[in-house]
């Protein structure tokens, strides 16, 4: 059923968002030393607003995050932020760039199993040097036949990747934690997607899945369940996994189909 299986990296293969949360906490303490007291919600709102506004100019990643923190510090202090505090933000960014890569449980075994049967692709957004460095340090690079580091994940970007590698969209599967980046644009481009929600995620990556997209995406509790799902999808139609109906008392429908039998 699939010719290529692609994976997101950050918060799909390895932990990432908690590094940014730790960075925001360090930044909150920095602002407090500068005389600006913000609670967690206000800090999150300010930093996220600045980050999202800057995506168009600086893209995603630690460098963009650090620039957004510096801009937030200037605004929050009315331009009175000290040079030493700006330097502390730079140190924070350097620490984030050098952090040890911690894989999610089941990732090495899942990639080893799938790479023996399918060409695997990594499609990750962010800073090229940092993403390449993380992939090398993760020990996962040998599993991937293709690596794509992009600035944004849109239907057009995915269409370009598929065209460049001669991949039929209907035989392409993308696996990731972000509905906005890994699921919806792939489905719109004609592919299939698996949503593996992460315990921690950036609010900007949340999105609603329209009804027409639900039957081309699946939701799994962990990446370790992926080989079983792919085996079931590749089996004859009678053996394919059934979708779990939405719970009657659930305030929110599942974003994608949740297989109940693999």
Spans of features found by a protein language model:
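Conserved phosphate-coupling serine/threonine residues in phosphotransfer and NTP-handling enzymes
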Residues: 124
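Short helix-capping segments at alpha-helix termini
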Residues: 33-38, 78-80, 139-142, 166
């Amino acid at each position: 059923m699939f010719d290529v299986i692609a994976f997101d990296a950050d918060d799909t293969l390895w932990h990432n968002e908690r590094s940014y949360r730790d960075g925001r906490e360090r930044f909150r303490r920095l602002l407090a030393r500068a005389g600006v007291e913000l609670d967690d919600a206000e800090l999150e709102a300010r930093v996220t607003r600045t980050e999202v506004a800057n995506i168009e100019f600086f893209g995603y990643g630690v460098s963009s995050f650090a620039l957004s923190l510096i801009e937030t510090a200037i605004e929050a202090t009315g331009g009175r932020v000290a040079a030493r505090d700006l330097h502390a933000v730079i140190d924070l960014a350097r620490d984030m760039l050098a952090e040890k890569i911690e894989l999610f449980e089941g990732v090495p075994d899942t990639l080893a199993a799938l790479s023996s049967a399918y060409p695997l692709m990594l499609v990750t957004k962010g800073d090229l040097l940092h993403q390449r460095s993380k992939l090398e340090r993760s020990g996962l690079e040998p599993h991937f036949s293709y690596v794509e580091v992009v600035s944004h994940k849109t239907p057009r970007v995915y269409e370009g990747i598929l065209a460049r590698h001669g991949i039929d969209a209907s035989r392409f599967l993308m696996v990731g934690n972000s509905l906005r980046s890994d699921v919806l644009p792939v489905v719109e481009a004609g592919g299939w997607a698996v949503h593996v929600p992460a315990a921690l995620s950036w609010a900007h990556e949340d999105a609603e899945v329209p009804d027409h997209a639900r039957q081309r995406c699946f939701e799994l509790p962990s990446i370790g369940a992926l080989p079983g799902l792919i085996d079931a999808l590749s089996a004859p139609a009678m053996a394919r996994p059934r979708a779990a109906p939405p719970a009657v008392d659930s305030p929110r429908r599942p974003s994608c189909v949740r297989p109940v039998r693999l």
